[in-house]
Every structure is written in structure tokens, then in C-alpha cells.
């Protein structure tokens, strides 16, 4: 039977699975316990400018917002951190969560 960790790494296109040998077998379960046992404020970094591509990333912000929405439902205060290129987009989809501009790229 596949674990959630197996499913996550099944379509690994960025070689993240090479880190698996350095992680606990149940890394998703351990991460969820860590989150649930530490309520409060969460910072989620997303939407950074890709120098080689000449544009802001587009796949990260929607997933980051979904994660933030789930954490809001669990009572967490969520802040998104992004650069000036992605800030308007992240603000547009982030509902009531605060977006902090971080000068990662000039």
C-alpha cells in the first residue's frame, strides 16, 4: 500500500525525492503534528521572481493560498511573504490575510 509520502513523490520533476533518505518514514504525519501542536502565526513564502525566466512563478501562489486557507480554518493567523512582482497577484487571491513584500529581487 502506498503512503501519502509515496504519492507526493510519485511525480517528482525537481528531484525532491532524493531527499527522502534523509527524512523520517512518516514525514507528512510528523509535519502535521508539528503544525497542530504549535498554533499561532504562520509565514508562507511564495510567488518569487525567477531571474532565468524573466517572470514571477505562477504555480506556487495558488497552492500557498490553499494552505493558508486551511490553516485559517484551524485558527492560525496567516501572512504571505512575496516580492514586488508577485505581490499584486498574491493580494488579489489571499482574501483577508496580510501580504508582506520582501525585497528578494531588485
Stretch-by-stretch model annotation:
Residues 46-48, 83-84, 102-104:
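Fold-independent oxyanion-binding glycine-rich loops
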Residues 94-106:
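A glycine-rich helix N-cap at a beta->alpha junction
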Residues 19-23, 41-62:
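Short, glycine-rich nucleotide/cofactor-binding loops
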Residues 1-41:
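Positively charged, low-complexity intrinsically disordered leader regions
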Residues 85-91:
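Short, charged/polar "capping" segments at the starts of alpha-helices
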Residues 77-83:
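Short internal beta-strands
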Amino acid at each position: 500500500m502506498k503512503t501519502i509520502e509515496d504519492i507526493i513523490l510519485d511525480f517528482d520533476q525537481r528531484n525532491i525525492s532524493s531527499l527522502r533518505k534523509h527524512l523520517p518514514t512518516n514525514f507528512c504525519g510528523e509535519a502535521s503534528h508539528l503544525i497542530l501542536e504549535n498554533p499561532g502565526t504562520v509565514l508562507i513564502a511564495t510567488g518569487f521572481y525567477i531571474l532565468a525566466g524573466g517572470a514571477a512563478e505562477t504555480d506556487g501562489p495558488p497552492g500557498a493560498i490553499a494552505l493558508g486557507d486551511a490553516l485559517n480554518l484551524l485558527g492560525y493567523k496567516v501572512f504571505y511573504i512575496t516580492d514586488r512582482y508577485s505581490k499584486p497577484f498574491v493580494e488579489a487571491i489571499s482574501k483577508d490575510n496580510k501580504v508582506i513584500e520582501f525585497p528578494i529581487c531588485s
